Regions:
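Short, low-complexity, intrinsically disordered N-terminal peptides in bacterial proteins
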Residues: 1-2, 83
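Amphipathic, hydrophobic secondary-structure cores in small proteins
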Residues: 2-5, 9-55
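C-terminal structural segments of small proteins and small subunits
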Residues: 50-83
């Protein structure tokens, strides 16, 4: 299954993004992220279904709460994508 991870710098940042997405009708799972994703040790990500990624990014931009990094995850691995 392909999905996107929106990286957040803190749990509060992740919760704010999740609230914006929920208000836009997009469900997202908040997960703890390791140093490989955040490059800063502990952090959080929101798992976004591939079909909702563009709309999720628009909702975050409109709400002024952007992810610090966006990663695309597929069977082939994980790669960072442009915001």
């Amino acid at each position: 299954m392909d999905y996107y991870l929106f990286a957040a710098r803190s749990v509060t940042h992740a919760q704010r993004m999740a609230r914006l997405l929920s208000d836009a009708g997009i469900s997202a799972k908040i997960r703890c992220a390791g140093a490989a994703i955040t490059e800063r040790g502990c952090g959080y990500t929101l798992e976004i279904p591939r079909r909702h990624a563009a709309r999720a990014m628009q909702a975050c931009r409109a709400g002024g709460v952007l992810p610090v990094k966006v990663l695309f995850v597929s069977d082939d691995g994980m790669q960072e994508v442009a915001l």
